[in-house]
Curated annotation (Swiss-Prot):
Source species taxonomy: Eukaryota, Metazoa, Chordata, Craniata, Vertebrata
Quaternary structure and interacting proteins, as annotated: Interacts with beta-actin/ACTB.
Protein name as annotated: Josephin-1
Catalytic activity reported: Thiol-dependent hydrolysis of ester, thioester, amide, peptide and isopeptide bonds formed by the C-terminal Gly of ubiquitin (a 76-residue protein attached to proteins as an intracellular targeting signal)
Keyword flag Glycoprotein: no
Chain's gene name: JOSD1
Domain of life: Eukaryota
Length: 202
């Protein structure tokens, strides 16, 4: 089973109305080259200056010094399509940890109030200009709470996608985790990870 676009609960979503208050200011960094890991990190922190391509490249080189043997390989390997090790190391520089979620478990066991945000890795369609190719590639996205509601801040979206409250978020996560090659990371402060207080079942 592959990941399919999130449609939500159609019956409920049609009857739901957004809060009448002014919408929150949401930082949504959009896709540029193959920098989805960078965009996901900056969207989690809601800060365009949280990380740069250069800082992630430095972390990548520190973790894999032998991959940068010659200058011509640097541009090939440093294309911004970073793996989970770079994301985890980047979060640690800010005092945060990435907790891998075992998708066999119920997402109801996540203590949402102790989680700053979520980074998901899932298959995404490749595009060539306006054309969508019949190919998929793994892609990093951010989901987090802003102003009392959860949003999908996928850098490929034109604008933030409103998910809703905690129950809608859990449905969103369950929907994607049922798919093939979909993984979930919880972004939590170091002390939360140390005490495992991201778990609601302890």
């Amino acid at each position: 089973m592959s990941c399919v676009p999130w449609k939500g609960d159609k019956v409920k979503s049609e009857s739901l109305e957004l809060p009448q208050a002014a919408p929150p200011q949401i930082y949504h960094e959009k896709q540029r080259r193959e920098l989805c890991a960078l965009h996901a990190l900056n969207n989690v922190f809601q800060d365009s200056n949280a990380f740069t391509r250069e800082t992630l490249q430095e972390i990548f080189q520190r973790l894999s010094p032998n991959t940068m043997v010659t200058p011509h390989k640097k541009s090939m390997l440093g294309n911004g399509n970073y793996d989970v090790n770079v994301i985890m190391a980047a979060l640690q520089t800010k005092g945060y940890e990435a907790v891998w979620w075992d998708k066999r478990r119920d997402v109801g066991a996540i203590a949402l109030t102790n989680v700053m945000g979520f980074i998901m890795n899932l298959p995404s369609s490749l595009c060539w200009g306006p054309l969508k190719l019949p190919l998929k590639r793994q892609h990093w996205i951010c989901v987090r709470e802003v102003g009392g509601a959860y949003y999908n801040l996928d850098s490929k979206l034109k604008m933030p996608e409103w998910i809703g409250g905690k129950s809608e978020l859990r449905k969103f996560l369950k929907h994607h985790l049922r798919g093939k090659n979909c993984e979930l990371l919880l972004v939590v402060p170091e002390e939360v990870e140390a005490h495992q207080s991201w778990r609601a079942d302890v």
